[in-house]
Every structure is written in structure tokens, then in C-alpha cells.
Amino acid sequence: MKFYASGLLFDNDGVLVDSHAAAADAWAIWCSEYAPQVNWDDPKHAGQRAEDKVREWISSPDLFEVANNRINELEQLTAHTTIALPGAVDLTSSLRDGTWTVCTSANPNLGRARLLAAGLPVPPQLVTAADVKLGKPHPDPYLLGAERLGFAPEDCVVFEDASAGVAAALA
């Protein structure tokens, strides 16, 4: 049986790169400062935009911007420790431009920094948290990724590891 797809849409963290230790360190510090009641390492939080998690955990609108800026700062400081998952460099370097992209829940700077730290190319069609109104589990990131590649969503395959991303891909 053969399967054909026009476009390949990859999540980044956990699919192409391993940033778990760096993210865990950043979120542990952030939670100790802003939300000590939160167990950030719970898998249900994986794959979602930091801004959405901060909004969920910080009830004060006045504190949201400060808290959101802080997690962005902490994650950026640890991005350089990101490594490529086995086979990711060979895979992405073998794909033709315009046939694949990354749809990440990270902000633009963090998404690029993690890809570059891992030695992976940054696709021109990169989709980040800032590009969509609704992040995963909503389908917006993957719909935009397909659109940027010029393909119908049903002609694309999504590679995803987090339940929020799988829900986005299936929506």
C-alpha cells in the first residue's frame, strides 16, 4: 500500500527536537515565582502555547503580561540546550523546500532558536504561536501550515507527539 501526501507538517518539540529538559527548567522557575500550585510537567500541558497556559494560571490581567514575558525570557535563556532527535537532521535536510514546515506552539524567537540550536533548518513557512489566534488543540496552526505550503489540509500529513497537537491535527 502506498500513501501520498503533498505537504508534511511537523510539530517541533518532541518530534524534531528535544527541548524537554530546558522547558522543564524554565517552567519550574516560572511556577515557583508565579504559580506554585501548578504541576507544569503534567502531560496535559504539553504542546500548548505558553501564553495560553499563563492566561489559564494567572487570574490577574495586570500580572499576565509580566508573567508571560518572564516565561518567554526563561525559555529563551535555555533554548541553546535543545538537541535534534535522532534522524531529524537527515530527514529535514532531505525534504524539498516548500513541501514541509514546522507548526510550533513556541513564540517566533523561541521556535527559531530551538531549531537552530538543534542544527535544523528553519523553514520559510514556519508557523509559530504568534501567527494564529488560537493555538493547539485548535486546528489553526496546522491549517495555516497547509495554507503557507499551498496545499489543502487533507493533502498534508501531521507529525505530532502531544495530545493537544493530535487534537489540532484531527480537528
Map each language-model feature to its residues:
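Conserved phosphate-coordination/catalytic loops
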Residues: 82-86, 136, 160
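Substrate-recognition "cap/lid" segment bordering the active-site pocket of phosphatases
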Residues: 101, 107-157, 163-170
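Active-site flanking residues adjacent to catalytic metal/cofactor-binding acidic residues
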Residues: 10, 159-160
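N-terminal helical cap/lid subdomain that shapes the substrate entry/recognition surface
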Residues: 2-96, 107-109, 120
